[in-house]
Amino acid sequence: MASKSWLNFLVFLCGSAIGFFLCSQLLSILLREEAAIQPNMLHNDPHARHSDDNGHSHLKGQMNFNADSSQHKDENIDVAENLYQKVKILCWVMTSPQNLEKKAKHVKATWAQRCNKVLFMSSEENQDFPTVGLKTKEGREQLYWKTIKAFQYVHDHYLEDADWFMKADDDTYVIVDNLRWLLSKYNPEQPIYFGRRFKPYVKQGYMSGGAGYVLSKEALRRFVNAFKTEKCTHSSSIEDLALGRCMEIINVEAGDSRDTIGKETFHPFVPEHHLIKGYLPKTFWYWNYNYYPPIEGPGCCSDIAVSFHYVDGTTMYELEYLVYHLRPYGYLYRYQPALPENILKEINQVNRKEDTKIKLGNP
């Protein structure tokens, strides 16, 4: 009897050890898969858009890639300058007191310089940075409150200073010049907004908060007025989804932000997550959320991409260099989408000499 009990005990121990080993191996595989996506993301929550700061102790201060412009003094930027005047964009960046030095200052040193006007929105005012104090609390549950108050502030103080109003996070990188091309085809008095379009929960879809989204002037008017008339309320702490529901209620169209050949321009992750096949497992929420069929690999992203998300300070400068400085010698751009005729005509009037005439458009 004693030997049988001892045998049962040994079987139990062996079974427990094997079970523990298999569970630990499975957990390790799952954790590695999650870490491969983004170590600092809340992976199972498509609306968790702010990553934790990685420290980046080597990044002591902000850099200015445009300080030494001697290499680019003869660069022809007539088109970009004309669009800067014709398509005026106010950018507001959602940040927090603890992220001014870790994140927001790198946005300020890079892409934000190309907005016609930029504002940093925080829970507290900081006159040195500076930030607009929205007098809210911090935390994920406050994101929609901050968004509502930020758009109200922009509407009350800067409505006539821009045509379009872009919201971005402090870990979003935006190629503002490409955004201007996208918006140049539209009238800011049209009730419409653009971003990375997701499909669940809202009939017309809604725009991913992390990839950023941009409202027309009329969309901004309607959004602010909807809270005055109580057509919309603070119905959820999930900022992008709640804003999307409000937009549908007030008949603001969810626009198609893809380029002329159907490639996406707004991206909710860093480039590598979209460009490398298999980086995002098929069980990941992303594949079920896209309004348009998503593509992975080199075909994922437009040549005139507008935004990427979860971009840390170091990567901000890497993207700034790759987008605005690195050039392959001897190549002309293969994909040059057309400009609206009225803008193209004005540019060519400025460039009267035949050798400097700008020819833009698909062949």
UniProtKB/Swiss-Prot annotation:
GO biological process terms on file: angiogenesis; core 1 O-glycan biosynthetic process; intestinal epithelial cell development; kidney development; protein O-linked glycosylation
Residues that coordinate or bind Mn(2+): D169, D171, H309
Residues that, per the record, bind a glycoprotein: W285
Domain of life: Eukaryota
GO CC annotation, single: membrane
TM region positions: 9-29
Pfam families cross-referenced by the UniProt entry: Fringe
Cofactor(s) needed: Mn(2+)
Protein name: Glycoprotein-N-acetylgalactosamine 3-beta-galactosyltransferase 1
PANTHER family in the cross-refs: BETA1,3-GALACTOSYLTRANSFERASE (PTHR23033), GLYCOPROTEIN-N-ACETYLGALACTOSAMINE 3-BETA-GALACTOSYLTRANSFERASE 1 (PTHR23033:SF13)
Originating species: Mus musculus (Mouse)
Segments on the Lumenal face: 30-363
Keyword line: Angiogenesis, Developmental protein, Differentiation, Disulfide bond, Glycosyltransferase, Manganese, Membrane, Metal-binding, Nucleotide-binding, Phosphoprotein, Signal-anchor, Transferase, Transmembrane, Transmembrane helix
Gene Ontology MF: a single term: galactosyltransferase activity
